[in-house]
Amino acid sequence: MAGHRLVLVLGDLHIPHRCNSLPAKFKKLLVPGKIQHILCTGNLCTKDTYDYLKTLAGDVHVVRGDFDENLNYPEQKVVTVGQFKIGLIHGHQVIPWGDMASLALLQRQFDVDILISGHTHKFEAFEHENKFYINPGSATGAYHALENNIIPSFVLMDIQASTVVTYVYQLIGDDVKVERIEYKKS
């Protein structure tokens, strides 16, 4: 695995207000020592959840969600992992939520290869004009005002040279389903 960087992307956990904890099946998959970086789209909402993430990886980046108690989290962040510049926002700033044109504008403002946003509690990953966009969804499947059927999800990015292999983990019923999406920097 030389040259690989594993990045865990997750957010909208809403612990303990909407959910007690991460699904047990996700916790089993998230083993300390395997992941180098964590990018979190916010709404953790407490220090306990942050401390748990710190046990999984030394390098944890969090942006502030609209329900986060810690006001010291920045609104936005740009992180470089390998050859990739990655922008991180919670997503409540994107009007309308999840809007492609608004996301593309932010991507250009941040000048990033990958833009990660959350807030909608709905997983998405797609390429648009040679840039890559990820919304990891809600890792706990926390409810959302606009969405009834929330599927718990998180994303692992395997970054190697100019390629990112994105693995999406979704808890559908009792089974963890994994989907693989590849993005090459042009």
Curated annotation (Swiss-Prot):
InterPro entries (UniProt xref): Calcineurin-like_PHP_lpxH, Metallo-depent_PP-like, Phosphodiesterase_MJ0936/Vps29, Vps29
GO CC annotation terms, alphabetical: cytosol; endosome; endosome membrane; retromer complex
Membrane topology value: Peripheral membrane protein
Main location: cytoplasm
GO biological process: endocytic recycling; intracellular protein transport; retrograde transport, endosome to Golgi
Single GO MF annotation: metal ion binding
Subcellular location: Cytoplasm; Membrane; Endosome membrane
Keywords, ordered alphabetically: Cytoplasm, Endosome, Membrane, Metal-binding, Protein transport, Transport, Zinc
Subunit description: Component of the commander complex consisting of the CCC subcomplex and the retriever subcomplex. Component of the heterotrimeric retriever complex formed by VPS26C, VPS29 and VPS35L; within the complex interacts with VPS35L. Component of the heterotrimeric retromer cargo-selective complex (CSC), also described as vacuolar protein sorting subcomplex (VPS), formed by VPS26 (VPS26A or VPS26B), VPS29 and VPS35. The CSC has a highly elongated structure with VPS26 and VPS29 binding independently at opposite distal ends of VPS35 as central platform.
Functional summary from the UniProt entry: Component of the commander complex that is essential for endosomal recycling of transmembrane cargos; the commander complex is composed of the CCC subcomplex and the retriever subcomplex. Component of the retriever complex, which is a heterotrimeric complex related to retromer cargo-selective complex (CSC) and essential for retromer-independent retrieval and recycling of numerous cargos such as integrin alpha-5/beta-1 (ITGA5:ITGB1). Component of the retromer cargo-selective complex (CSC).
Family: Belongs to the VPS29 family.
Protein name as it appears in the record: Vacuolar protein sorting-associated protein 29
Species per Swiss-Prot/TrEMBL record: Gallus gallus
